[in-house]
């Protein structure tokens, strides 16, 4: 099986470490960025199978990043999962309207998170084995 490559964009170190650990525990190859600018720089040389991105990033928020990714032919096909601590009514719809393929709330529920990721990279998660 080919290891799927995921770009994790999260500015909070604790959340980044947790999400990175969960992804790596499922066999995914993970690259990490802490800002939108850093993510865009990485995407110049890398084409991940999935982007898992915090909505509240410094500088440019995750929804704006998702919109910009969908506008660029080189990145338009990369699914984005939005991760947010805000779960207000309509937030999921805003994320999907911005081009996100999925939406996960914090605190991250391991099973939900892994299933959402697996649904967008085409891998069966280890929790389903």
Language model segments and positions:
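The feature encodes the CheY-like receiver
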Residues: 16, 58, 76, 88, ...
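Charged docking surfaces used in two-component/phosphorelay signaling
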Residues: 17-25
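Short, glycine/charged-rich "phosphate-handling" switch motifs in NTP-dependent
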Residues: 101
